[in-house]
Amino acid sequence: MWIGVVSLFPDMFRAISDNGVTGRAVKNKLLSIQCWNPRDFTLDKHRTVDDRPYGGGPGMLMMVKPLRDAILAAKKAAREAGHEAKVIYLSPQGKRLDHCGAQLLSGSDALILVAGRYEGVDERLIESLVDEEWSVGDYVLSGGELPAMILIDAVVRFVPGVLGHVLSAEQDSFADGLLDCPHYTRPEVLDGKQVPSVLLSGDHEKIRLWRSKQALQRTKQRRPDLLNNLALTDEQAKLLAALESDSD
């Protein structure tokens, strides 16, 4: 997967390209990340990248020309690498990123992520160059770099070969609309707390059912809203009914 990033702070993305799952993906040539800094497209000695908004008000906007030229340079590089990249602007006004959204975006072989700063970006740039706007939540950050890194990490997990186990992405929280079940590792007893005996039984079917029940229970307790839009399987419906009966 090819990802271009337009950011005033490209060095921040070394956290993604040099570390963890995404760093390993870069090393294994499953992921390529390139950055463009709008400051490199300025013409004045101060490398100015902000400008006053029409109509007044607090704060500044990103200057149009350097940002536009940086996005166009990223699009050109994508084409030269054989990609037709989708341009995404990270914005609180965008569609909320979730598991399904990350999986959907992973189907693109190339993305260009625009990380804004200041009070935002000229609306005409968004209309002419941005294909989609995405948000990571209903809160405001100092810039789009952290949301861009969140999006990269979430999306790249779905790229074949990136995760160590083929089922890892399929069994994450939200993969089937539910929160994940509890997990345990050694030691068998920790501070007097025992690993659930079913996990030591070696009975794979019992373990599967236990994990399914635990996922339902955790979702019901912590995120009951997720159950409202979930089409339960017959098995899940029976397990959920049993949980509700036990709580009566």
From Swiss-Prot:
| Species, as recorded | Psychromonas ingrahamii (strain DSM 17664 / CCUG 51855 / 37)
Q: Where does S-adenosyl-L-methionine bind?
A: 116, 136-141
Its subcellular locations are: Cytoplasm
Question: What CDD domains does the entry give?
Answer: TrmD-like
Enumerate the PANTHER family for this protein.
Answer: TRNA (GUANINE-N(1)-)-METHYLTRANSFERASE
Record-level Gene Ontology MF annotations: tRNA (guanine(37)-N1)-methyltransferase activity
InterPro entries per UniProt: Alpha/beta_knot_MTases, tRNA_m1G_MeTrfase_C_sf, tRNA_m1G_MeTrfase_TrmD, tRNA_m1G_MTases_N, tRNA_MeTrfase_TRMD/TRM10
- Name the EC number(s): 2.1.1.228
Q: Which family does it belong to?
A: Belongs to the RNA methyltransferase TrmD family.
Q: What is the lineage of its organism?
A: Bacteria, Pseudomonadati, Pseudomonadota, Gammaproteobacteria, Alteromonadales
Name the UniProt record assigns to this protein: tRNA (guanine-N(1)-)-methyltransferase
List the catalysed reactions: guanosine(37) in tRNA + S-adenosyl-L-methionine = N(1)-methylguanosine(37) in tRNA + S-adenosyl-L-homocysteine + H(+)
Gene Ontology biological process terms from the UniProt entry: tRNA N1-guanine methylation
Primary residence: cytoplasm
